[in-house]
Amino acid sequence: MIKINNQYKIKLKVKLKGKIKEELLMKLENQYLLVEVSEDGAEITKIYNKEDGTDIIWEGNPEFWKRHSPVLFPNVGKTYKNKMLINGEEYTTSQHGFARDSVFECVESTDSMVSFLLNSSEETKKKYPFDFKLFVNYYLEGKEVKVEWKVENTGNETMYFTIGAHPAFRFAKKDEVKSDYILKFPGKDQLEYILVDKETEDGMGTAIPEEKRTLKLENNTYVLNEEIFDNDALILDGTQIEEAWVCHKDGTPYVGMKCEGFPSFGIWSVKDAPFVCLEPWMGRCDDRG
């Protein structure tokens, strides 16, 4: 380990497909939480609750999902036919953008915060033709981790983008399943959501706005189950979610987030996976077609 400004940069070697990959992690820690953030994607890979000994962030087991808490940029979701048209030029896109698969630079660190930077490059311009700086900052404050994004347009033309979070919250015990947990949305009696296209070839992964549905809540809560994710994510538009909690089925809070002002919000998991993703999005890709 290399110590930098009272922070520890943990150097891991991971063997992938016969190749050795080095991953650098920055560590934040106080009396309540231990947080690790990777320079790969500026992604939180661990939040450990010292009080009850639980790991809150999904560990990235590829049996279900290889990621932990990716940053989604410059597009949230999937574009129609995986294409994006900008100033008359067509670009091929990937679901949720390229930031999550990019190596960021750690530009600042203290005992309680870390800041990562992704600069535009010739490589990013093959997918997204704008000059930019993307800062992803994490602040450890008591029992909370605060996330801040700063997007700077360093070019001379209007820059279009969306950005979002995709944290996966793992269940506290290994033998727990979705029905052991409830989602709580304070102040809400019901929510409207749309689904993702899972059938048409061109529109696969895009939102279907004409199929709006209602998620009925009881005492602001919804009992998690496998079937709700049969069609992939639930997409909630219209700035419906400002606060969301994952709670044990007896109502005891497990982990929550505040996300005021986000126009869209995603809820997602994988079949039989012991985690659920709560995803505040500042915009998203267009609907199917």
Regions found by a protein language model. Give the residues of each.
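Beta-strand-rich N-terminal accessory domains
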Residues: 1-86, 90-94, 239-260
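Active-site/ligand-binding surface loops and adjacent short beta/alpha elements
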Residues: 2-4, 171, 175-259
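Extended, loop-rich substrate-binding clefts of extracytoplasmic carbohydrate-active enzymes
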Residues: 4, 16, 89-142
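Hydrophobic residues embedded in beta-strands of well-ordered beta-sheets
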Residues: 26, 45, 114, 145-147, ...
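Acidic, contiguous internal or C-terminal segments within carbohydrate-active enzymes
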Residues: 28, 120-174
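Structural motif
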Residues: 30-31, 40, 109-110, 141, ...
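Buried hydrophobic-core signal for structured, non-transmembrane domains
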Residues: 37, 88, 147-151, 278
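Acidic/His-leaning functional-site neighborhoods
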Residues: 91, 96-108, 217-289
